[in-house]
Amino acid sequence: MYTDFYKLNRNPFEITPDPYFLYATKEHKEALAALYYGVRQHKGFVVLTGEVGTGKTLLIRCLLQLCKGSDIASAYVFNSRLSTLEFLQYAATDFGLSATGKHKGELLHELNRFLLVRHQKQLTTMMVVDEAHHLSTEVLEEIRLLTNLETADEKLLQIVLVGQSELSDKLDSHELRQLKQRITLRAYLEPLDFEDTKGYIQCRLQLAGASSGTACLFPDETIARIHHFSRGIPRLINTISDNALITAFARQLASVSVGIIDEVADELRLGVGRSRSVCVFQTTKGADQTLSVGQSLLQLRHQY
């Protein structure tokens, strides 16, 4: 639609999580380094949280891609509205195990045997659970019990829980106090500040084939308005920017004005609120891996 008019080779503001378009802020690099470190060092439980649309699923897809082709076998559970049995069946199937018709005890036995064989070969096994804030207390407790699968010196299964901020509240509950005690690393994705919002928009335009001239599609005052309405949430930045380009294209305009952003925000019924501010926590060793993870992200982008 507007891609030809603005000489782009693809839509720069798709809301589908695509590692090719990852704009890695300092916080994103630190969070990814912390997750990767936790898995590599067999820490057991790692948690990633953030508000809706801040890029959690995209970051996890980058983690899965970084682990792909290595000694790390991964199961990715993204349907969190499952019973305990369904969850175990889903995880076992994603690990390549036969789960059809098996009851809970049989599934646990299969998983334990699978993990022990991999451990004996000095291989790492990771389970990523997305949308974990929707998990029932019963399923979360079952996940905790999976970390009982261990040797005398380390956990056999590395678990990454990913969810909205409500996940942290759920993990603070009395019923899940034992699970909370087993969490060794936490990372939180903050919304973007103005400078990162500007860098995010420019990066996506460039990756979509924008020339230096086309990169001026969004003047600073326009980006400031996008940041104002989006509150720095990448998903909203994409939605606003995409709609703004459609409007600008319809009017055959060379750039997006502040007025267009106001129109789009009004049509989308976007209000302004304060986002929750939480610091990212990571270990020192996790921070040491930030540079190497950043280099890996560049290599990852070239795969797409």
Across the structure, where does each feature detected by a protein language model lie?
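Mid-core helix/loop region of P-loop NTP-binding domains shared across ATPases and GTPases
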Residues: 83-84, 99-142, 151-154, 193-197, ...
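Short regulatory helix/loop adjacent to the ATP-binding pocket of P-loop NTPases
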Residues: 64-67, 167-182, 191
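Sensor-1/coupling segment of RecA-like P-loop NTPase cores
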Residues: 47-52, 58, 106-110, 134-139, ...
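Trafficking entry modules
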Residues: 2-13, 18, 23, 256-304
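C-terminal helical "lid" subdomain and adjoining coupling/linker elements of P-loop NTPases
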Residues: 20, 152, 210-283
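Conserved NTP-binding/hydrolysis module of P-loop NTPases
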Residues: 8-13, 72, 82-101
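Walker A/P-loop nucleotide-binding motif
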Residues: 41-63, 80
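Conserved AAA+ ATPase "SRH/arginine-finger" region at the nucleotide-binding site
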Residues: 77-81, 171, 184-197
